[in-house]
């Protein structure tokens, strides 16, 4: 399809012929995402021409066809100049029935026919593409208060107008993700957090039985319908952006506790496929990670449903779901940074500040040790898998796994080493300045960990570096004469000296405060401390 033919018909003013040519173009390019550079100028002119047709035509079929073409063209960020202007954005906002600053648009309620609704949907899709691909369009969207104009529509989001709701939520997500000023306005002035929370309540059919406790789902209830699940995920993504600030006033905490209650309800639900369930739960976990830690007690405090007596009546169903999710992500064996670190972080902070959660998780992951014949990183238990991650190449992953286990050990270095071995924990201890032992800064309850009799009996024989009982090895020095020992010692000193002079290695020592320092400096500091303590 020649772009020049389409441009000629647009200039001629025959919208029927334009529509016919555009239908053919759309069919040919529906899956086109890479465009010919030589036709870039023609595509820019076509964008401008399409806006002209959209302003002069009032035929829904012609409008939706033009918008579909514009949506295809908007995949190319280099041709969006005409669309990213005030006039271009106003045209699209008007067709999407969004009221923007200083321009009263036609309300959405008046879009009765399927053809008119198709125009609204295509306009929203265009806006999503244009905002995503064009910084000037993002700026113009902020100036026109496009996101604020979307907020009244959130009252109408439902499965009956699925695509209108879906792309309205997606556009709100994009605007709030790409513009911090828009995010702030939505939080403080537009009441978007409450509106999005209401969307989730309606979409998930939440029925409250307590201040922050939703009625448990019926075991025989069908899974979340696919359309409702799509709306849920878009609302969760938008809420994630809007809960990134640290606002903790009384009203904000109430709203965030409601969100935590809805997330608990959502984690109990299933969708039509295991893959979609995991994706939805992943968005819920991301959102929970944004909430202040004092709101997370909502996950376990459900008086109507009740809980476990050994955990002071707290309900651990949600915590178990989070643990199962974490294990599933570990077992996948890839994409740990994006897929695993959010749930690790959530479980870590929950365990750090909620004693019952920590006790429950520790019972699952770090039960009392019995068999210490194998290294901590060898095996298929959750502990083995997490210890392996402590030496992962990705810094965020290794730190997340190490911090999680450290918190489960109440930030006690001795307890951590018991479960992981010094070698696996060295990175965390060095970063925390705890190589000499001690505890972290968080205050924990005084209940003590008890060792099993099996562990106590072999404790003196455990290699503290590897964390397990090693088979006795023959001492190579036993077969050497004194002259051979002296020769090997001198050779070792020479090799270390050569590597040090070439700065390939740097001998390190531990200061009294547990931090690392070059060996000479560490010895000097210790000498000064010793001489100071000996003086009167």
Swiss-Prot record:
Under InterPro entries, the record lists: ARM-like, ARM-type_fold, Chaperone_Ric-8_A/B, Gua_nucleotide_exch_fac_Ric8
Indicate whether Cytoplasm appears among the record's keywords: yes
| Chief location bin | cytoplasm
A Pfam family of the record is: Ric8
> What biological processes does GO assign it?
G protein-coupled receptor signaling pathway; pigment cell development; sensory perception of smell
PANTHER family (UniProt xref) = SYNEMBRYN, SYNEMBRYN-B
Function comment = Chaperone that specifically binds and folds nascent G(s) G-alpha proteins (GNAS and GNAL) prior to G protein heterotrimer formation, promoting their association with the plasma membrane. Also acts as a guanine nucleotide exchange factor (GEF) for G(s) proteins by stimulating exchange of bound GDP for free GTP. Acts as an important component for odorant signal transduction by mediating GNAL (G(olf)-alpha) folding, thereby promoting-dependent cAMP accumulation in olfactory sensory neurons.
The protein's name in its UniProt record = Chaperone Ric-8B
What's the source species' lineage? Eukaryota, Metazoa, Chordata, Craniata, Vertebrata
């Amino acid at each position: 399809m020649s772009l020049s033919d389409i441009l000629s018909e647009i200039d001629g003013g025959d919208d029927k012929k334009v529509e016919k040519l555009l239908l053919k173009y759309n069919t040919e390019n529906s899956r086109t995402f890479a465009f010919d550079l030589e036709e870039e100028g023609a595509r820019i002119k076509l964008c401008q021409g399409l806006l002209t047709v959209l302003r002069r035509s009032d035929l829904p079929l012609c409008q939706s066809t033009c918008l579909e073409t514009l949506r295809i063209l908007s995949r190319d960020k280099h041709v969006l100049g005409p669309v990213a202007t005030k006039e271009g954005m106003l045209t699209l906002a008007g067709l999407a029935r969004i009221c923007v600053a200083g321009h009263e648009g036609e309300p959405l309620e008046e879009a009765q026919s399927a053809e008119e609704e198709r125009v609204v949907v295509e306009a929203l899709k265009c806006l999503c593409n244009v905002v995503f691909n064009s910084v000037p369009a993002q700026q113009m969207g902020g100036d026109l208060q496009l996101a604020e104009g979307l907020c009244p529509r959130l009252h109408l989001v439902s499965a009956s107008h699925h695509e209108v709701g879906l792309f309205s939520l997606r556009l709100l997500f994009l605007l709030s993700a790409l513009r911090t000023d828009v995010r702030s306005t939505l939080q403080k002035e537009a009441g978007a957090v409450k509106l999005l929370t209401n969307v989730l309540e309606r979409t998930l059919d939440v029925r409250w039985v307590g201040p922050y406790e939703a009625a448990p789902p019926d075991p025989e209830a069908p899974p979340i319908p696919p359309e409702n699940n799509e709306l849920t995920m878009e609302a969760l993504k938008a809420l994630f952006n809007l809960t990134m600030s640290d606002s903790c006033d009384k009203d904000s905490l109430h709203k965030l506790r409601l969100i935590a209650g809805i997330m608990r309800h959502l984690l109990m639900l299933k969708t039509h496929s295991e893959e979609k369930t995991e994706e939805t739960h992943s968005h819920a976990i991301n959102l929970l990670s944004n909430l202040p830690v004092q709101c997370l007690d909502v996950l376990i405090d459900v008086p109507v449903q009740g809980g476990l007596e050994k955990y002071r009546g707290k309900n651990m169903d949600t915590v178990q779901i989070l643990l199962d999710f974490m294990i599933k992500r570990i077992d996948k064996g890839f994409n740990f940074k994006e897929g695993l670190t959010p749930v690790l972080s959530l479980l870590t902070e929950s365990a750090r500040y909620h004693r019952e959660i920590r006790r429950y998780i520790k019972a699952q992951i770090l039960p009392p040790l019995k068999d210490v014949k194998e290294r901590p990183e060898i095996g298929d238990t959750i502990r083995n898998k997490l210890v392996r991650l402590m030496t992962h190449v990705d810094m965020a992953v290794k730190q997340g796994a190490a911090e999680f286990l450290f918190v489960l050990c109440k930030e006690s270095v001795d307890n951590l080493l018991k479960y992981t071995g010094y070698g696996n924990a060295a990175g965390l201890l060095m970063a925390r300045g705890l190589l000499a032992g001690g505890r972290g800064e968080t205050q924990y309850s005084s209940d003590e960990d008890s060792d099993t009799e099996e562990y106590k009996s072999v404790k003196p024989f455990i290699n503290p570096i590897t964390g397990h009982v090693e088979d006795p090895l023959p001492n190579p020095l036993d077969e050497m004469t004194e002259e051979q020992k002296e020769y090997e010692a001198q050779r070792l000193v020479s090799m270390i000296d050569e590597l040090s002079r070439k700065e390939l290695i740097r001998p390190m020592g531990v200061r009294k405060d547990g931090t690392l320092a070059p060996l000479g400096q560490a010895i000097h500091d210790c000498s000064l401390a010793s001489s100071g303590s000996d003086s009167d």
